[in-house]
């Protein structure tokens, strides 16, 4: 049986054979007050259910389809909001960066920095992120096979950072559609020598509208897709929720309604406990 690596976010262990961690929040920081509201709800629910939790939001959505789409408050204001969330709720935070210059300032505030899928092969950005010593979450590009993610892990290791989490978010299946290959989770574990794998169920539900500038989505299928991912035995779920998804400023069609969070997580925890309670069967 392949040994599973453990990455620590502070004193929080992240591994494929440990109880799942929730990396979740909102897509983009829309306002300080909304971030506080959403984070508080996540903290209350995860504490009640005993689920390890890391708050997620972006300060800049630098890869929006349209130049007219909302991008966020920017790094300076975003980091102020993140610091207030940490001070208020004692929560760990994950956010994404897009340039080398953002790496150290962001790593000084948050606990995990994320390498976006579209930038996952950019060596200069990888080097800058690695040098911070922070835990890194790598989004697997939609165009990359599960076998190839091991190359990204190796690149970070060559740059001196082995604190790597890998995130599945679906693969391109023809034009404007994403499909999650459930066999890919096991392949990613093997190709990365047991690195923690988390599943971004929210962005896996995106479906492009070829006639429009915004992404559509299939949030009504969140539960079934998340269950399928959890059943493969992974380290965590990556999720976005919103009090009113139809009014969200980014990716609302894929976001979970915030009032569904507790029943959703109850089912995910029950399934995760069941799956990880089974004896491992090794087939060669």
From Swiss-Prot:
Q: What is its EC number?
A: 2.5.1.55
Stored Gene3D superfamilies = Aldolase class I
Q: Which InterPro entries match?
A: Aldolase_TIM, DAHP1/KDSA, KDO8P_synthase
Name its GO BP terms in alphabetical order: keto-3-deoxy-D-manno-octulosonic acid biosynthetic process
Q: Does the keyword Acetylation apply?
A: no
EC category: transferase
* Family annotation (HAMAP family): KDO8P_synth (MF_00056)
List the Gene Ontology MF annotations in alphabetical order.
3-deoxy-8-phosphooctulonate synthase activity
User: Which keywords, in A-to-Z order, does the entry hold?
Assistant: Cytoplasm, Lipopolysaccharide biosynthesis, Transferase
Q: What is the designated name of this protein? A: 2-dehydro-3-deoxyphosphooctonate aldolase
This enzyme catalyses: D-arabinose 5-phosphate + phosphoenolpyruvate + H2O = 3-deoxy-alpha-D-manno-2-octulosonate-8-phosphate + phosphate
Q: In which pathway does it act?
A: Carbohydrate biosynthesis; 3-deoxy-D-manno-octulosonate biosynthesis; 3-deoxy-D-manno-octulosonate from D-ribulose 5-phosphate: step 2/3; Bacterial outer membrane biogenesis; lipopolysaccharide biosynthesis
Q: Which GO terms describe its cellular component?
A: cytoplasm
Q: Which organism is it from?
A: Vibrio atlanticus (strain LGP32) (Vibrio splendidus (strain Mel32))
Which protein family is it in? Belongs to the KdsA family.
Instruction: Indicate where this protein is primarily found.
Output: cytoplasm
Q: Which PANTHER family match?
A: PHOSPHO-2-DEHYDRO-3-DEOXYHEPTONATE ALDOLASE
